[in-house]
C-alpha cells in the first residue's frame, strides 16, 4: 500500500469553510492499491484514535464511529510503560500488516517485530528497544495520521458527494474542493512519487483516502483495552501486559519476589525470572556458548545479549540515543542510556543505608561497589595461579587482569593506537588529540580470562634498571617478561613485583644500581615505570591500589609533582 501524506505542517494544508462559518482543516492522504468493493465499504465511517509512543511520536488506531468500539486490536507495552495498539486486518484486505514475530521486552512485555533489515527503513522512524535477554530489537513507527480524524475512501475517478461520514457533515464547498483535488492528483499521481513512497506497478485501479480533521467538534474516544490486556493494579503503575504471565513477572518488581534460586555450591542467589537464573548459573559453570565471529577475536559470552554488546565494540554501533534535545549522545545499551539520562535529570535513586553516610548513586553498579567499602567485601578474585588478588569491583579485576596478558582492548578512535588500561587511553586522547569526552566502560561484556597455562606460557616479567638499549630489551630475572604502557602512550617495559624480597637488579654499564627499598618494614608491591626519556620511576602502591593508579602517580611525578601514596 502506498501512503503519501501531506501533514498539518505542510504547505498543502487547506482550509475549507464549514457550515457554521468555522474552518475545517483538511489533510489529504493518497492510498494506491487494487480497488475492492468490499474493502471500500469497510472504510466508511472510520475514525482514528491517537496514542503516544515512548519517543514522543504518535501511533493511530481505527475506531468504528457507529458503535464507538475499537476494531480488533492487540495491546503492546513499550519500555517506558506506555501502551501502543496494533491493528489486525484479515489477509487480503487493503490495509495489510507486515509479518511480525512476538518478542519479549526487558520488562516482560511482548512486542511484535517485523522480519526485515532495519536499514531498509528511514532511521529516524526506527526505535531501538532492549529485549529480555539483552539483545536489541527495532520498532518501526509507520507514517503518522493526524488525530481525531474520519477516513473517507473514494475511487480516484469517482465523486465524494455520496460518501457516508457518520456523525460528521461536509458542506458543498468542501466537497467541491475535494473533487477538484481528486481530479488533480489523479492526473499528477502517475508522474512520480515522493522519495519515501513505494510505487504500485498496477496503475489500472486506484483509490484515494481523504482524512478530514474535525478539531474539537468530535472529541477523541479514549483507548479501550481488549480482553487480552492485563493491567498492573499497584498504585502509580498501571502498566499493561498482553498475558497474565507477563503481568505476574512485572509484579515481582513491586513485591520483590524472586522465586528462582541458585543452589550451586551454597550460592543461594535468587532471581525474578528463569532466564536470569540461567544466565547466573553460567558464572559458576564457566559456560560461554556465544562466541564472537569477528576475525582474530576469540571472546565468548554467557548470553546472546553480552555477545551483541561486545560486537558493537567492533562495529561502533550505538543504537540507544539520548532523548534530551541538544545532547546528541548515543549508547551501546539501553541501561547505559538510562543511567546517562540521570545526568540530565539529577536523579540518584540508590541511597546508601549506612548510618552517617547518606551518599546516593545514579546506577545500581556504583551503589553496590560503594556498599562494599562499608562491608569490606571483595568478591572478585584473580584466577591466575599465584596471584589471588581480590577486588571490590568487577571492573577493577578486569583492569588488573591485563597485567597477566598481552591484551590491549582499548582503541583510540583518532589514531588507532591500542592500550591495556582505559585510563591510559583517556590520557593519550587528552594529550595527543585534545579529546576530553568520557570513555564508556563495559569491561564485563568482554572480559574473558585466559586459561592459566596460556597466561604462564605467554607472559613474562622484565626487571628494568638503567639499561637503555636500542632494541629496548632489558636484563631479565626468572625468565618472565611483561610489557606495559608508559605515560606518553608508547610501549615501554615496567616492573610489577608482588613482594620486595622478589625484586632485585644488578648494576649495568648503562646505569647505576637502583635501591628499591622505599622505606618501611612492611613488604608492599612496587611498580617501576620506564618512561620515554629513559627515566625510571619506582612507585610503591598500597593493597587497595591498582596498576592504573601507579601509572597515574608516575605521570604526575614526570610533571614535577610529588603525589603521596594515598593521593
Curated annotation (Swiss-Prot):
Zinc fingers typed C2H2-type, residue spans: 230-254, 260-284, 290-314, 320-344, 350-374, 380-404, 410-433
Organism listed in the record: Xenopus tropicalis
InterPro entries given in the database record: Znf_C2H2_sf, Znf_C2H2_type
Chain spans, region Disordered: 506-525
Subcellular location: Nucleus
Gene3D superfamilies documented for this protein: Classic Zinc Finger
Keywords of this entry: Activator, DNA-binding, Metal-binding, Nucleus, Repeat, Transcription, Transcription regulation, Zinc, Zinc-finger
PROSITE patterns: ZINC_FINGER_C2H2_1, ZINC_FINGER_C2H2_2
The protein's role, per its UniProt record: Transcriptional activator. Activates the gene for selenocysteine tRNA (tRNAsec). Binds to the activator element (AE) motif of the selenocysteine tRNA gene promoter.
Protein name: Zinc finger protein 143
